[in-house]
Every structure is written in structure tokens, then in C-alpha cells.
Amino acid sequence: METRLRILLIEDGLPKPEVQMPLQDETGSLIARPDLCYPEERIVVEYDGATHRESVAADNRRQNRLIDAGYRVLRFTAGDLLHRPSSVSALVRRALSA
């Protein structure tokens, strides 16, 4: 579904996002390799699939580190992609324009 999200954004005229780009904090430590990223704008786009409780906790810690490093994190689900695709691309577009 990450690929589907990327294709949706590109087909809606948004710039091509980086895929699984390693992001580091100010000390050079790896924070995350998000699904999609616009590094210059410090925008991270994540697809949330079916997860277990342990991975939710890890995702939350990673999101907190990204926010602490100055990234804006947008999260989407399969329902968003399948039922509200225009809302997904509109939100990413607004974030890129901010």
C-alpha cells in the first residue's frame, strides 16, 4: 500500500517523495526510514497497516523522535487510500505549501 500511496501523490501532481530515506537527528543518530519523505520540507508521510501492539509502541516512539527533530508526520490507512484519496493528497499538498 505504500506504493499505492506514493503513486496517488504523484498522479495528483505532487512532487515525488523519497522512499525509505534514512533520517538522522542533530547528533547523526538514525531516527527512522519513513515510508515517504519530503526532506527539504521536513514532511514525513507514513502508511499505517495492520499492526501488533508492540509495533504501535515502536511507531509512537519513532514519531515522537521525528517530531522532536522538526519533522511534520502525516499518517494514513488503507481506508484513507481506498475511500478518501483526494483528502490524502490534499493534506499532503497543504503540508508542502506551509
Predicted features along the sequence, with ranges:
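Surface segments flanking catalytic/ligand-binding clefts of nucleic-acid enzymes
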Residues: M1-A98
